[in-house]
Amino acid sequence: MTAIRGAVNLTPSSAAAHSHLSRGLAFAGYSDEAIQHGEAAMRLSPLDPEMALFRGGIAIAHFTARRFDESLRFTEENLSLRPGFQGAQRLHCASLAQSGRVEEARAFLSTVRRNHRPPLTIAWVRENVPYQTPELMELYVEGLRKAGLDK
């Protein structure tokens, strides 16, 4: 995270640097700061073709802050920009489940499973999704389990 902060300090007008920092902070649980950097990225480059990544950091930040409805708002926007974006699909599924919309999450999981390469498993999530604390990883995995991901 130090290197990404350094990039933001060296080039504060870089939307990409703010976006990378936003996602790093979000995965570490620094939600409010992550949102600030995600918003900065969107402000600096409002027509950027990577807008889904900018919004992704904000969606993750809301999820880690347990603001699941806000996370859903951002994942829905991300999926409208990039329907096949696997990270947004997984987060959308976990956010639906954690917000209590378990039936919707279960239905959406079938879409996620159909499109996910390699096949989506809890083991794959633990190995590849970079939540930085056990608590945050468990929050995410719990959402996917509620949606019906069982192994």
Question: At which residue positions do the language-model features occur?
Answer:
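Alpha-helical protein-protein interaction modules
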Residues: M1-P12, A16-K151
